[in-house]
């Protein structure tokens, strides 16, 4: 089994190191991750400059680009064979609801999915979190299940793991994405040189967090597994649009 592992926290993050060690028990692991923290990079590609691929002393590869760059470069330009699975994580902090739109962790897995490879995005729902070992064990269990019973077509799964000991997890459930309120307003400040600067505000509280959502599952101590789709079509509006365009 050939695994391509990436993240958005950077190649030096504890989460990717722990997951790489775990996945090595199941197959060959290639790590290609950003050279620095690129949280919130979403699905952006670097188009204004060339990318450089370097190798760290621990054998990991790092790129001066985004998480999407890392997976795209690895699959289309670095690896001799397409990986059997792309895994992004383990992220330090949850990626639930609207977070998935901005998340570099989810974006790296999305790129693998777009390239035809089954892909997982894995996040520990706490920052920094105390139980990376739990997230590693959950990921390995899901990977084994995918190896034993593969889906009929490439699948993109977003996994969020409660920050608790493995034996305290209540189970694993299929969920849909919840939704947050809008983010808090930007914070205006002045830097030491007297320039006015702005910090993006914190994520808003969960708004749609009822039963069946990823927020609810994690809050109740369950691992949340949400299948994601790339189709952004608004089908409800699509049904009404022809009559609106041609009254």
Swiss-Prot record:
Binds 1 divalent metal cation per subunit. SUPFAM superfamilies: SurE-like. Keywords: Cytoplasm, Hydrolase, Metal-binding, Nucleotide-binding. The keyword Cytoplasm applies. Its main location: cytoplasm. InterPro entries: SurE (IPR030048), SurE-like_Pase/nucleotidase (IPR002828), SurE-like_sf (IPR036523). It is found in: Cytoplasm. GO terms for cellular component: cytoplasm. Its EC number is 3.1.3.5. It catalyses: a ribonucleoside 5'-phosphate + H2O = a ribonucleoside + phosphate. One of its GO terms (molecular function) is exopolyphosphatase activity. Its cofactor is a divalent metal cation. A divalent metal cation binds at residues 8-9, 39, 91. Nucleotidase that shows phosphatase activity on nucleoside 5'-monophosphates. NCBIfam families: PRK00346.1-3 (NF001489), PRK00346.1-4 (NF001490), surE (TIGR00087). Belongs to the SurE nucleotidase family. This is 5'-nucleotidase SurE.
């Amino acid at each position: 089994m050939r695994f391509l592992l990436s993240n958005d926290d950077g190649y030096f993050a504890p989460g990717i190191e722990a997951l790489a060690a775990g996945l090595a028990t199941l197959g060959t692991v290639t790590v290609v991750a950003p050279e620095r923290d690129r949280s919130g990079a979403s699905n952006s590609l670097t188009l204004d400059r060339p990318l450089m691929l370097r190798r760290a002393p621990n054998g990991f590869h790092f790129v001066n680009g985004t998480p999407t760059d890392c997976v795209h470069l690895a699959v289309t330009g670095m690896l001799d064979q397409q990986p059997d699975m792309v895994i992004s994580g383990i992220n330090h902090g949850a990626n639930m609801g609207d977070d998935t739109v901005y998340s570099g962790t989810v974006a790296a897995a999305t790129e693998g999915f777009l390239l035809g490879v089954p892909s997982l995005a894995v996040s520990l729902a706490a920052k920094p979190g105390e139980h990376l070992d739990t997230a590693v064990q959950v990921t390995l269990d899901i990977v084994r299940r995918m190896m034993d019973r593969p889906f009929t077509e490439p699948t993109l799964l977003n996994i969020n793991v409660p920050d608790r000991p493995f034996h305290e997890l209540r189970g694993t459930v299929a969920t849909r994405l919840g939704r947050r309120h809008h983010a808090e307003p930007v914070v205006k400040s002045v830097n030491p040189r007297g320039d006015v600067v702005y910090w993006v505000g914190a994520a808003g509280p969960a708004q749609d967090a009822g039963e069946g959502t990823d927020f609810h599952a994690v809050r109740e101590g369950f691992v949340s597994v949400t299948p994601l789709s790339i189709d952004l079509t608004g089908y409800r509006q699509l049904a009404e649009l022809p009559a609106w365009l041609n009254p």
